């Protein structure tokens, strides 16, 4: 679960990182989106925070490899906590480096109405367990 963001947090983040009026000017955002919305980048960070704090320390993460896909189907709004779902979709051993592999997972974040506001498929390089020789 990712905590809700306040209007002030959304505006503060947007002023520094994504200063579009739809994230900083509530009156303007209301005309277009029915109210203030969070930057997609802030939504992504909210979705990834539990993953980085809870999952990544438990796996032998070497580093991220980018995103196979990244979407914001709906905006995140002030006061909406996000439900986070993670599904591992593939694990592939490296052909050139036997001590590592690539794990791909789908990360979904949904608002309280269970509508998806963020979905991504990031591949991650991970260490493999040593195989036992017989």
Model-identified regions with their sequence ranges:
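Hot-dog-fold acyl-thioester-processing enzymes
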Residues: 1-66, 129-134
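HotDog/MaoC-like acyl-thioester-processing domains
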Residues: 72, 76-81, 85-134
């Amino acid at each position: 679960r990712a905590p809700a963001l306040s209007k002030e947090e959304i505006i503060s983040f947007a002023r520094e990182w994504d200063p579009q009026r739809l994230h900083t000017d509530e009156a303007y955002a209301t005309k277009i989106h029915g109210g203030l919305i969070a930057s997609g980048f802030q939504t992504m960070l909210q979705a990834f925070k539990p993953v980085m704090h809870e999952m990544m320390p438990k796996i032998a993460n070497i580093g991220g490899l980018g995103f196979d896909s990244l979407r914001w189907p709906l905006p995140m709004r002030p006061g909406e906590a996000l439900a986070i779902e993670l599904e591992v979709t593939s694990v592939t051993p490296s052909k050139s480096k036997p001590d590592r592999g690539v794990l791909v997972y789908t990360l979904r974040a949904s608002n309280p109405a269970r509508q998806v506001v963020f979905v991504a498929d990031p591949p991650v390089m991970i260490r493999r367990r040593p195989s036992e020789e017989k």
